A protein has these predicted regions:
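A structural signal for conserved, well-ordered secondary-structure elements
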Residues: 1-719
C-alpha cells in the first residue's frame, strides 16, 4: 500500500469515527422519555409500569383482542405518549408505560373495564355499551352517488326497544355517545329507529368511521382480563441505572484500550481505534433499528466489547507467530489475518447461536440482552476483520514498520496440561460437589435448592431505599413487622441489597390495594421516598413458563452448538468434549448461585448462555489450533503424538486465552463495581463464569478430547 493511499484510508476512518462519535453523543445526550432522537429505554432504565394480562375467556377472537388492545392504548395514551400495548401469544396483552409517577393509580385504572354510554341531550344515560351487539365501519354511496363513510350499529333486543323509544321522542336532536367520560360522537336523530339497526353518518374517512366503530364495540366487550405479571420501577432508580452503567462502560473501555496498547503496541493502537468505532456503531444501530435498551442489554453491549477484543487478540497472536518464523511484518500481517479467520468465525457463530436461542425462547429483558449481544457479535466481526485490518495496514504504510512495534512470539516449552488432567478433573469435581451439597442442604432447610426469584417462583417483590445502612437485625425488627401487618403473611423474606441502603421484601402475591398499602406504610413509618420504590408481581403461571423456557434455552443452544462443531471439525469427539465442558461451566455457575445465594431470576438464563457462548468461543480457538497441528502430523497418531499436539496447542494459545479473559473480565468488573444492584447480581456470576470458562477451555475441554480420542471411536489412537 502506498503512503498516500494509506493516509487517505486512515483519514477516512478517523473522519468516519468522528462523525459516528458526534452522532452517538447526540443520541446518548437525547436518550430519555419523549426525546425524538433517542434510544428507547426499557422500564428498568426509564422507570414506569409494565403489566401483563391473561384473557379469562377461552379462545378469544382476533377482533376482540384487537378491540381490547385499542381500548387499553387509548387509556394509556393519557399517561404517556411513549406508552405501548401489544399482544403476546394468543391470549395475553402487555402494557408498558415509561416515565410515570403514580404507578399504582395507573394499575388500578387499567383494571377497570371502561364504559360506553348513549346519553340524552340533558346528559342522562339511556343505554350502555352492553346493549350494542356489533358496530362496523363501512363505505356506501348516497342517492347522488357520492361516497360516504358510516358506522353501522346492531343492537340487542333490549337495546333496540330502548333505542326505538328514545329516537322517536328526540327527532332532530343530538344524542351524545360517551366513552370513559369523553364524547366520541354527537349524532343527530334523523328519524325513529325501531328495527334494532342504525347508521351514524358524517365521517370524513373510512379510518375515522372504523375507529369510532371500534370504540363503540369496546364498550360492549365482555372480555375479562386477569393480571399475570406487573412491574413498577421508580424513575429515580432508572436514572441511576443508566448513568452508572454508561460510566462503567466508558471506564472499562478506556482500561481495555490502555491494556491493548501496552500489550500489543501498534496493533493495540489499531485495535483501540477499532473498539471506539465498534462502540459508536452499536449505539447508532440501537437507534436506527429502534431497539429498546435494558439493563441486561447494556451488559450485552459491554460483553460485546470483550468479544471484539478477543477477535483482535487472536489476529495479533497469529501475526507475532509469523514474525517469529522469520517472515516480514507485512507478510505476517496478511497471513495472520488469514489464519485467524476460521477460529474467529467459528467462535463467534457459536456465540451467535446462544443469542438467537435467547431471542427465540427468552422474553422481556432477556430478549433485550440477546438483541444487543447479537448486534455486538456482528459488529465485532466487522471491526476486527475489516476496520482493524485497514488501520493496521495504513499505519505500516505510513512508516511504522519496525518489527519491535509488532512483537515476536517467544518459543515456549510445551506445558504438560494433559499430564495434569486428573488434578483438573478432581478440582472441578470438588467445586461441583460443593454446589450440589449446598443445594441439598438448602433444599432440606428452606424448601428450595436455589434462591429462586419471583421469575421462577411467583409472588410480589418490593425494593425500597431506606436512606441508611441497616443490619439484618434492624430489618427484622423495624421493617418486617410492618410488612407482616399489611400482608398478613408470616413468611416474609427481607434481604439487604449489598453495597446500597436498599432492602428487598418478598411476599406472597399481593393485590393492587395491598401493594399500595405497603408502599404507603413504608413511606409513613420508615421515611422511604416513594419514588425509590420498585415492585414486581409474577403469577405462578408466568414463573412456571420461565423455568421451562430457561431449561429449553440451555438444551436447545447446546444441541445446535454440538451440531455446528461436529459439522465444522468433522469429528464428534471435538463436539462432545466441548459440550461436556459447557455442562461443567453451567454446573459451576449454578454452584456460585447456590453458595452465594444470588437470586435466580430472569437474567439467570442470560448469564448462563453468555458464559456458554464465551466458553465455547475460547474452546474453539484451542480446537482450531489442534486441528491445524493434527494436519501437520501425517500418518496414524499414537497416544503420545496426541498428547504432544494437545499440549503444544494449549501452550500456543495460552497467552491469547489469558489476555482475552483479562479484557472481558475488566468490562464485567466495571459493571460490578459501578452498576446498580440488579446489574451486580448479573455481573458476579458472570465474573465467576468467565474465570470458569477460561479454566474449562484450557484444563477440561482439551483433556476430555484427548481421553475420547485415545479410547473411543473408529480412529482412536494407538497406545
Amino acid at each position: 500500500m502506498k503512503k498516500s493511499k494509506a493516509a487517505v484510508i486512515l483519514a477516512v476512518i478517523i473522519a468516519a469515527f468522528a462523525g459516528l462519535a458526534y452522532y452517538a453523543s447526540i443520541i446518548l445526550s437525547s436518550t430519555g422519555i419523549g426525546e425524538d432522537m433517542s434510544i428507547p429505554l426499557g422500564l428498568d432504565l426509564s422507570g414506569g409500569v409494565s403489566i401483563t394480562y391473561q384473557v379469562v375467556d377461552e379462545n378469544p377472537s382476533a377482533e376482540d383482542m384487537s378491540d381490547t388492545i385499542y381500548k387499553l392504548q387509548k387509556r394509556v395514551d393519557s399517561y404517556s405518549t411513549e406508552a405501548s400495548v401489544y399482544q403476546v401469544g394468543d391470549d395475553r396483552i402487555t402494557v408498558e408505560i415509561p416515565g410515570v409517577q403514580d404507578a399504582n393509580e395507573i394499575l388500578e385504572d387499567l383494571g377497570n373495564p371502561g364504559s360506553l354510554e348513549f346519553q340524552m341531550p340533558d346528559g342522562s344515560v339511556f343505554m350502555t355499551g352492553d346493549m350494542v351487539e356489533d358496530a362496523q365501519g363501512a363505505t356506501t354511496t348516497d342517492r347522488y352517488g357520492n361516497k360516504q363513510y358510516i358506522v353501522s350499529l346492531k343492537l340487542t333486543d333490549e337495546g333496540a326497544k330502548i333505542f326505538g323509544e328514545v329516537t322517536s321522542e328526540n327527532i332532530g336532536k343530538n344524542l351524545p355517545i360517551v366513552y370513559d367520560g369523553e364524547t366520541i360522537s354527537y349524532p343527530r336523530v334523523q328519524s325513529a329507529i325501531t328495527g334494532g339497526e342504525a347508521q351514524i353518518t358524517g365521517m370524513s374517512s373510512f379510518e375515522e368511521a372504523d375507529n369510532l366503530a371500534t370504540q363503540i364495540r369496546i364498550g360492549s366487550l365482555s372480555l375479562q382480563l386477569t393480571e399475570l405479571e406487573s412491574s413498577v420501577v421508580g424513575a429515580q432508580l432508572g436514572s441511576q441505572a443508566i448513568s452508572s452503567s454508561l460510566k462503567a462502560g466508558a471506564i472499562g473501555l478506556a482500561v481495555v484500550m490502555v491494556f491493548m496498547i501496552v500489550m500489543y503496541a501498534v496493533p493495540g493502537i489499531a485495535a483501540s481505534l477499532a473498539l471506539a468505532i465498534y462502540t459508536t456503531l452499536v449505539i447508532a444501530t440501537l437507534y436506527l433499528f429502534d431497539i429498546t435498551l435494558t439493563l441486561p442489554g447494556i451488559a450485552g453491549i459491554i460483553l460485546g466489547i470483550g468479544m471484539a477484543v478477543d477477535a483482535n487478540v487472536i489476529v495479533f497472536a497469529r501475526i507475532r507467530e509469523e514474525i517469529a518464523t522469520g517472515k516480514s511484518v507485512q507478510t505476517s500481517m496478511k497471513i495472520g489475518f488469514q489464519k485467524a479467520m476460521s477460529a474467529i468465525l467459528d467462535g463467534n457463530i457459536t456465540t451467535l447461536i446462544a443469542s438467537v436461542v435467547l431471542m427465540a425462547l427468552g422474553s422481556g429483558t432477556v430478549k433485550g440482552f440477546a438483541y444487543t449481544l447479537m448486534i455486538g457479535i456482528i459488529l465485532s466481526l466487522f471491526t476486527a476483520m475489516v476496520v482493524t485490518r485497514y488501520i493496521l495496514y495504513s499505519l505500516y504504510a505510513l512508516g511504522l514498520k519496525s518489527e519491535k512495534l509488532y512483537g515476536r512470539a517467544k518459543e515456549r516449552k510445551s506445558i504438560d496440561f494433559i499430564g495434569k488432567k486428573a488434578v483438573f478433573f478432581t478440582i472441578s469435581g470438588i467445586i461441583i460437589a460443593a454446589g450440589l451439597i449446598s443445594m441439598g442442604v438448602h433444599s432440606a432447610t428452606e424448601g428450595k435448592a436455589l434462591n429462586y426469584g419471583l421469575d421462577f417462583m411467583g409472588g410480589t417483590s418490593t425494593t425500597a431505599d431506606f436512606g441508611k445502612d441497616m443490619t439484618i437485625e434492624d430489618i427484622e425488627n423495624d421493617i418486617v413487622p410492618y410488612v407482616e401487618k399489611v400482608t398478613g403473611d408470616s413468611d416474609v423474606q427481607a434481604t439487604k441489597v449489598e453495597g446500597t441502603t436498599q432492602v428487598t421484601i418478598k411476599t406472597r402475591t399481593l393485590s393492587l390495594d395491598e401493594r399500595q398499602e405497603l408502599e404507603d406504610t413504608l413511606a409513613e413509618n420508615c421515611d422511604v421516598d416513594a419514588s425509590t420504590i420498585t415492585s414486581q408481581s409474577i403469577s405462578s403461571t408466568i414463573s412456571g413458563e420461565m423455568r421451562s423456557d430457561a431449561l429449553k434455552a440451555v438444551i436447545v443452544s447446546c444441541i445446535f452448538m454440538l451440531l455446528y462443531i461436529w459439522f465444522r471439525f468433522k469429528d464428534i469427539r471435538f463436539a462432545a468434549s466441548a459440550i461436556l465442558a459447557l455442562v461443567h461451566d453451567v454446573l459451576v455457575v449454578i454452584t456460585v448461585y447456590a453458595l452465594v445465594r444470588i437470586s435466580v431470576g430472569s437474567t439467570f438464563i442470560a448469564c448462563v448462555l453468555t458464559i456458554v457462548g464465551y466458553s465455547i468461543n475460547d474452546t474453539i480457538v484451542i480446537f482450531d489450533r489442534i486441528r491445524e497441528n493434527l494436519a501437520l502430523k501425517t500418518g496414524k497418531q499414537t497416544a503420545e503424538d496426541l498428547r504432544e499436539i494437545a499440549n503444544k496447542s494449549l501452550t500456543q494459545t495460552l497467552s491469547r486465552s489469558i489476555n482475552t479473559s483479562i479484557t472481558t473480565f475488566i468490562m464485567v468488573v466495571m459493571l460490578y463495581i459501578l452498576g446498580v444492584a440488579s446489574i451486580r447480581d448479573f455481573s458476579l456470576p458472570l465474573m465467576a463464569g468467565l474465570v470458569c470458562g477460561a479454566y474449562s477451555s484450557i484444563c477440561i475441554a482439551t483433556e476430555l478430547w484427548y481421553v475420547m480420542k485415545v479410547h473411543f471411536g473408529k480412529n482412536k489412537a494407538t497406545k
